[in-house]
Amino acid sequence: DLNLKIFDLTHEIPPYNIWEGAYRLYQTASYWPQGSVFVSVVDPGVGTDRKSVVLKTKNGQYFVSPDNGTLTLVAQTLGIDSVREIDEKANRLKGSEKSYTFHGRDVYAYTGARLASGAITFEQVGPELPAKVVELSYQKAKATKGEVKGNIPILDIQYGNVWSNISDELLNQAGIKLNDTLCVTISEGSQQKYAGKMPYVASFGDVPEGQPMVYLNSLLNVSVALNMDNFAQKHQVASGADWNIDVKKCAK
């Protein structure tokens, strides 16, 4: 179909990192229109009995992926309309039946292209499954008086800024305002990796060079940075389902 538009969102997901694949889908999906078909293949279980599915979200988008946790965040934020298992007898690249390790090409890209072009309908993808997907466990963002807690899903890797899943709405619910002094604690599982004080400011230039700060990133989520330095590298902070952050008001 010469009218079909194909966009590469990224080929930079670290190998086997299902969590980062899940976050990048969440980060980008809302900018695309109803009817968009996303193909996401982070598939360390390729060739095993994990299911290959197409998720239709409540806003009318389609996500073609292994059902291994990749769909966690789009399912939670966009809502599940329905899920279908890919019928590989009907929706698999012809001649690839003996290939067990390249389902990205043989199953997912093939099915996604056929669905996006109208060669098949959503109903022709395969049998309908219960309206749920495999979900990764992580710290959901929450607010109490003077304090917010959440997960560190991703790093702004070029600059070493630490992004959380804590929204500006939750910050407001906690009563945290610009120029408040905040105590920030970052942990990997039960192990504390960082604890320190810093101001909540609008932008990087509001603190001296090399100093820490809390700010809102482009998604309007709570983030931590060093002005013109690399916070994640300096403090050995990473991201993922096991990385958590606690931010609360404290004395200067």
Outline where the language-model segments fall.
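Anionic-ligand-binding alpha/beta catalytic cores of soluble enzymes and soluble regulatory domains
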Residues: 94-178
